[in-house]
Amino acid sequence: MAEEAQYEYLVPLEKYLSAGVRLGTRLSNKYLEERGFIYAVRPDGLRIFDIKKIDERLRIAAKLIARYPPDRVLVHTTRPYGFKPVQMFCKFVGCKALTGRFIPGMLTNPNLSNYLEVDLLFVVDPRLDSQAVAEAAKMGIPVVALVDTDTPHQYIDFMIPCNNKGRKSLALIFWVLARQVLRERGELKPDQDLPVPPEEFETRLVQT
């Protein structure tokens, strides 16, 4: 417990909690359980992630992403709540953003007009973004992914366990990652923040 109390999170623990980053689903991937990512199960069956492990994986992911030329990293999501976070992340970090439909062949068919040459693929949800993941695996492109408690882990080279469905969770995750990648590159000082708060990464709900 003393060691846990001394651990310094990338953002205050309260921020992670209020954004719901640790909230999983009622379904569970045994592989994630074996890796120790799932901390507890609530009485209603909802799985809860270990926030310390989320934080640790974000640190490692930032180091990994920072090693690649930004224009050789593709960040993809088909989840609407992920559009704004991905676009903002790529704006600050310089990666390629692909939101919405992934056209088959974009990573495997050089004859396509929208063919992309990338060295690293980062997806928000391997289940929804399965076409991109499958093509990356076929081409030998490493895959980083946000994974929920029920996410399939096949072809994922590096997993970041978290709530990959929530609006606030995705905003905070990508804000933290963007800041940490820039710190790893030396473009931000170790104690320096992005010029915008996490809320600017959040998808806005439109009233109809």
Curated annotation (Swiss-Prot):
It holds the Pfam family Ribosomal_S2. Keywords: Ribonucleoprotein, Ribosomal protein. It comes from the Archaea. The keyword Metal-binding does not apply. One of its GO terms (cellular component) is small ribosomal subunit. GO terms for molecular function: structural constituent of ribosome. One of its GO terms (biological process) is translation. Belongs to the universal ribosomal protein uS2 family. This is Small ribosomal subunit protein uS2.
